[in-house]
Regions:
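Short Asp/Glu-rich motifs
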Residues: 3-4, 35, 130, 150
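Glycine-rich phosphate/diphosphate-binding loop of Rossmann-like nucleotide-binding domains
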Residues: 1-29, 41-44
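Glycine-rich phosphate/pyrophosphate-binding loop and the adjoining helix
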Residues: 119, 123, 127-158
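Glycine-rich phosphate/nucleotide-binding loop
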Residues: 33-135
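Short alpha-helical patches at coil-to-helix transitions and adjacent helical residues
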Residues: 4, 8, 100-104, 147
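Alpha-helix capping and helix-loop boundary segments enriched in small/acidic/polar residues
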Residues: 2, 97-98, 141, 145
């Protein structure tokens, strides 16, 4: 609880610098329920790493897989880190079954957030959406495409 109290204190101090942003505190168990039952009520969730990991994994039930979820860890003064929410997924490494969408969308997020390249980010997102609309799906989405096939299809739709 001590770290949660410190987190709340720092969040309240930082929030004062952003008067155009509404700060709302919510316990993680309540946030987890709302994230699943009414995800549109959240714009941005800011939390410490442990709760962020829990909430991001739980939110994967919305699209049905971690394989389509990008993530970013932003730094106030240094570079940001962009990666698939599932991390390196060592249990499926080298098997050709990983869904590349989360990595590809992480690149789109990087283009937009770190480089201001909105047009490039939108091109990538459109290519991913078009590929999914065409019914090209990896196994985690109920399809048959392997990692290389999904990547090639997205590239073809750029």
């Amino acid at each position: 609880m001590a770290t949660s109290k410190l987190w709340r204190q720092i969040a309240e101090e930082v929030a004062k610098e952003y008067s155009d942003v509404t700060l709302e505190h919510q316990l993680v168990d309540s946030a987890a329920m709302v994230m699943i039952t009414n995800p549109a009520c959240f714009d941005v969730v800011v939390t410490e790493n442990l709760f962020g990991d829990i909430l991001s994994d739980e939110s994967s039930v919305l699209p049905g897989t971690l394989g389509v979820m990008p993530s970013a860890s932003h730094s106030e003064s240094g570079p940001s880190l962009y990666e698939p929410i599932h991390g390196s997924a060592p249990d499926i490494a080298g098997k050709g079954i990983a869904n590349p969408i989360s990595m590809i969308l992480s690149v789109a997020m990087m283009l937009r957030d770190s480089f201001g390249e909105t047009a490039g980010a939108e091109m990538i997102e459109h290519a991913v959406n078009k590929t999914l609309t065409q019914g090209i799906l990896t196994r985690d989405l109920g399809g048959l495409a392997n990692t290389k096939q999904m990547t090639a299809a997205i590239i073809a739709n750029l």
